């Protein structure tokens, strides 16, 4: 069953040939659409191998692969808006751990998912690789326990 125009309202970036790339951190660029299967529990996974941010101390670029996994509830993130949102970090100065937590919190605010996790595999700098992991499970649901379990086992992946 195809989506109708009413279901696609609010999606303005996908298919737009005049894409404007943000020059600074832009959470407002994120767009969501309705999940047609809110009663099914399933994972959506995004692998974003070209993430870039700036070191807040030196201004030097940091590169990472960001992996986002979530179990949607009512809303889902539209992928082109996610791409542009992640691009908006290109001139944003923050530590790796901050970037991962900011991404997770912005996606929670947008979608209110049942569960979400964000993993950053940053390129080593000074001989040290930083791989922050942040997750969230909706309070009072089975996903709260899943978040705790995944947090303690995330390095076993």
Swiss-Prot record:
Q: What is its main location?
A: cytoplasm
Q: Where is the active site?
A: 55 (thioimide intermediate), 62 (proton donor)
User: Which keywords has UniProt assigned to this entry?
Assistant: Cytoplasm, NADP, Oxidoreductase, Queuosine biosynthesis
Pathway named in the protein's UniProt entry: tRNA modification; tRNA-queuosine biosynthesis
Subcellular localization, as worded in the UniProt entry: Cytoplasm
Question: Is-annotated flag, keyword Protein transport?
Answer: no
Look up the EC number in the record and give it. 1.7.1.13
Superkingdom is Bacteria
Q: Its GO CC terms?
A: cytoplasm
Q: Record keywords: RNA-binding included? A: no
Give me the residues that bind substrate, please.
Answer: 77-79, 96-97
Which InterPro entries does UniProt cross-reference here?
Answer: GTP-CH-I_C/QueF, NADPH_dep_7-cyano-7-deazaG_red, QueF, QueF_type1
Q: Name one GO molecular function term.
A: preQ1 synthase activity
Instruction: Give the GO biological process terms.
Output: queuosine biosynthetic process; tRNA modification
First-level EC class: oxidoreductase
The UniProt family comment states: Belongs to the GTP cyclohydrolase I family. QueF type 1 subfamily.
Q: What does this protein do?
A: Catalyzes the NADPH-dependent reduction of 7-cyano-7-deazaguanine (preQ0) to 7-aminomethyl-7-deazaguanine (preQ1).
Tell me the NCBIfam families matching this sequence.
Answer: QueF-II
Q: Which PANTHER family does the UniProt entry name for this protein?
A: NADPH-DEPENDENT 7-CYANO-7-DEAZAGUANINE REDUCTASE
Per its UniProt record, what HAMAP family does this chain match? QueF_type1
Q: What is this protein called?
A: NADPH-dependent 7-cyano-7-deazaguanine reductase
């Amino acid at each position: 069953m195809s989506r109708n125009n009413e279901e696609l309202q609010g999606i303005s970036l996908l298919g737009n040939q005049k894409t404007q790339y943000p020059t600074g951190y832009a959470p407002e660029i994120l767009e969501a659409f309705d999940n047609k299967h809110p009663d099914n529990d399933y994972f959506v996974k995004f692998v974003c191998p070209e993430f870039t941010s700036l070191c807040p101390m030196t201004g030097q670029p940091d590169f990472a692969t960001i992996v986002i996994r979530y179990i949607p509830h009512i809303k889902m993130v539209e992928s082109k808006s996610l791409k542009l949102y992640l691009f908006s970090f290109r001139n944003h100065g923050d530590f790796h751990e901050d970037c991962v937590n900011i991404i997770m919190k912005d996606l929670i605010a947008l979608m209110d998912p049942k569960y979400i996790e964000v993993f950053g595999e940053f390129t080593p700098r000074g001989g040290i690789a930083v791989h922050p992991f942040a997750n969230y499970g909706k309070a009072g649901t089975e996903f709260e326990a899943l978040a705790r379990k995944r947090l303690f086992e995330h390095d076993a992946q």
